[in-house]
Amino acid sequence: MIVVLVDPRRPTLVPVEAIEFLRGEVQYTEEMPVAVPWSLPAARSAHAGNDAPVLLSSDPNHPAVITRLAAGARLISAPDSQRGERLVDAVAMMDKLRTAGPWESEQTHDSLRRYLLEETYELLDAVRSGSVDQLREELGDLLLQVLFHARIAEDASQSPFTIDDVADTLMRKLGNRAPGVLAGESISLEDQLAQWEAAKASEKARKSVADDVHTGQPALALAQKVIQRAQKAGLPAHLIPDEITSVSVSADVDAENTLRTAVLDFIDRLRCAERAIAVARRGSNVAEQLDVTPLGVITEQEWLAHWPTAVNDSRGGSKKRKGMR
């Protein structure tokens, strides 16, 4: 006698070694889908008649399965679950919620923004707490947001994409940015970081050091990111204004909005300087739309010569902006 156990999530997929045995007389347990009797003409219910040579089931705890295995029946089972299979279940569950849930079906990318922000902060709290249980739960909540947004994108009338497209984009990015590690090469930390940054720069093809800086993030994180980009681009330190490097907090001042305004103004200055440097490099006889040469490395002298405003500091006070914005 033989017991064939299939994966309950994919009950119509059977192990290849079981195929020859399913051509004859087969019984199946009641949880199996109707596709079983349709596909196997000789199949009948496990409760009908005498025991057939083969029992097909997706339930390892079914009484008929337990009885036959206890009597010495041979077991042919589906391969063990692979890591990540529960993600497939989560995708299917999200699809069901999106199509059948009254609340889920009405949500948009914009309506979910506050939940995404809340879950991100809750995950950060979980990391800080050191609680493994809390961390696992909050990672799941953040994963829900990823699945939800991907499922909403699938319904878009223009440029729809699926969760598989999201995963494919991620895999392509990782494959491009960490080729050495993924190829099994022995690589130093410095070389890995260099590969990553080089690939990232090639992908983004930024025209400005401020490109791809997401201004919707908290003002302090925004300031840190912009300062980091500016320093990497060789901007002299004294051109970074005090109002974004030193934050003052008081009860009667909106510190978040004040800092954000200062950072956005600094971004404007960066872009103005970059445009002026580009004009100076290409000359007045070349139209801007014909100039596709990336700025590349900007020297300290270029930053200083084309910076659109002076910086408040204790040494020289402040000067007015040149009028560029």
Curated annotation (Swiss-Prot):
Alphabetically list the UniProt keywords: ATP-binding, Hydrolase, Magnesium, Metal-binding, Nucleotide-binding
Q: Which domain of life does this protein belong to?
A: Bacteria
Give the location of motif Important for catalytic activity in residue numbers. 219
* EC nos: 3.6.1.8
One Pfam family of this protein, by short name?
A: MazG
Is DNA-binding a UniProt keyword of this protein? no
- GO MF: 8-oxo-7,8-dihydrodeoxyguanosine triphosphate pyrophosphatase activity; ATP binding; ATP diphosphatase activity; magnesium ion binding; nucleoside triphosphate diphosphatase activity
Q: How does activity depend on temperature?
A: Optimum temperature is 37 degrees Celsius. The activity is abolished at 70 degrees Celsius.
Catalytic activity annotation: ATP + H2O = AMP + diphosphate + H(+)
Question: Is ATP-binding tagged as a keyword?
Answer: yes
Cofactors demanded by this protein? Mg(2+)
Subunit structure and binding partners: Homotetramer.
What name is this protein filed under? Nucleoside triphosphate pyrophosphohydrolase
Q: Which organism is it from?
A: Mycobacterium tuberculosis (strain ATCC 25618 / H37Rv)
